[in-house]
């Protein structure tokens, strides 16, 4: 399912690295990363990964201890533009904040307005541009 989603044009545009599936599947047991399939009414439609900010995210600058990062995509094209992205992101983050996570960060590409709008609807604010191993990104934050 995830492999099929990664091949969808609307996903491949942003998750185009041919090693993405290998990267995602190789991290299944990583203690700092949790991966989820998001469903609505029993229908899987999105992928979400949440990770502890660590040494590989130094480009994000100093962050409060316990800060988590988030990556996601909607795999099913017919679910785009319907508010599902911001809704499941907000619900997921609210649960983490209830468990004591102080801040969430996300780093969309600056030329991905659909993602940026969804993250703003989910409560994220623009914090500035950062350079990442994947290229320039817009750091966005949401505090508990």
Give residue ranges: language-model regions.
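A short, well-structured alpha-helix characteristic of acyl/acetyltransferase catalytic modules
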Residues: 1-25
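Acetyl-CoA-dependent GNAT
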Residues: 17, 25-79, 95, 99
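Active-site beta-strand termini and strand-to-loop segments that position acidic
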Residues: 39-41, 141-144
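Conserved beta-strand segments that form the floor/walls of ligand-binding pockets within enzyme
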Residues: 69-74, 105-107, 139
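Conserved acetyl-CoA-binding loop-helix of GNAT-fold acetyltransferases
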Residues: 75, 81-98, 117-121
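Conserved GNAT acetyl-CoA-binding A-motif
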Residues: 96-108
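Conserved beta-strand-loop-alpha-helix junction that forms the acyl-donor binding cleft
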Residues: 106-116, 132-136, 142-144
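Conserved acetyl-CoA-binding loop of GNAT-fold acetyltransferases
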Residues: 120-129
